[in-house]
Amino acid sequence: MRKSFYSWLMTQRNPKSNAPVAILADLVFDDTTFPKHTNDFELISRYLEDQASFSFNLGQFDEIWEDYLAHQYVDKKESYRLF
């Protein structure tokens, strides 16, 4: 089962980093209404565009989403190796 985007994003938090993923992670951490239990791209993208209490470049979000998907694929491959 895939980790929610929020769960994965929280592993990317780093207040000292200027990387877009770290910035988004810190913004989302402080946003109490962010959809935490989903991995639905459309739902999260619409939330960031229409409802988030902060502004974030959606082009950068698309890149971060691709990184999230890549990590999910790697994690899945690693779990198969355990068996």
UniProtKB/Swiss-Prot annotation:
Coiled coil: none annotated. InterPro entries: UPF0346, YozE_SAM-like, YozE_SAM-like_sf. It holds the Pfam family YozE_SAM_like. It comes from Streptococcus pyogenes serotype M28 (strain MGAS6180). Belongs to the UPF0346 family. This is UPF0346 protein M28_Spy0369. It comes from the Bacteria.
